[in-house]
Amino acid sequence: MTQATPKVKICGIRTLADAQVAAQAGADFIGLVFVPRRRRRLELDLARELVEGLKSGPGGAPPVVGLFADQPLEEVNHAIETCNLDMVQLCGTESLDYCRDTKAEVIKVMHIPGSPSPESEGEMAQRIKAYRDSGCIVTLDSLVEGLQGGTGESFDWSIAADLAGKGNAFILAGGLSPENISEAVATVGPWGVDVSSGVETKG
């Protein structure tokens, strides 16, 4: 049985002011993008200043998550140490060994195809279990060619609902916005939700 109120991760934060607003609004995780060639990517020095400012404020701060995709492990671990990241979200094809060697708690993204077969759904459940058994939190996101996370597109929620109904805890991502997030939570029953492009105005 999933919790009534899912955890909320706000991703793609680029300024201290936005991070503070998200934290004050009750976000459980703050996400910063470090994936090359992504519109919301932050340089390490700016990210470090943002994290320092957020964590030095009154009342503490939610965990800060750095987003990466198929980048060298040394680069990821350097960013963790430089920016004082609490967690990382790995949006590519990173292996279990890669996750284990990361110097922070890991959120591992699994991309869901538009029309998976029953066999592939079974494989997804096995992969979720494998990553969770290794200490990772799992995120389910839509599969869009050429994009790794932050697609702005949803997938068939019945697939996620079926996985959740079988006891798989995960964060739901992909095209979530203020207009559809309540329906998504009611339909799927996820452990958490990840909103990014759906709450943006510009940039």
Show where each model-derived region lies.
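A structural motif
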Residues: 26-27, 84-85, 135, 189-190
